[in-house]
């Protein structure tokens, strides 16, 4: 369950859930009660609540369908428009196409 004791803003978390295509009822689910893709998006939402200037993610869309991938891209763009920098490693060409800057190795 999401840590309600750590000062998380539930309203903002629910906004993030909606942005990422997650149902609000997932807030009360345990980790083993959600799919891998849902778990991945929940962790992105919870991590974004920390309001750090830099978010580093590794393969944030690896277990997601194309629609969920697009939601993550738009979610990241929204965070960036509020001043957050996101550094990601990805092999997903759809994800890379949605990024401002791409470095290929």
What do the predicted segments below correspond to?
Residues 8-25:
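Conserved ABC ATPase "signature" region
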Residues 30-34, 38:
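Conserved ABC ATPase signature
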Residues 44-45:
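Hydrophobic anchor residue at the start of the ABC signature
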Residues 66-68:
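Helix N-cap at the start of a conserved alpha-helix in ABC-type nucleotide-binding domains
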Residues 72-73:
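Conserved hydrophobic alpha-helix in the ABC-type ATPase nucleotide-binding domain
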Residues 89-91:
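H-loop/switch region of ABC-family ATPase nucleotide-binding domains
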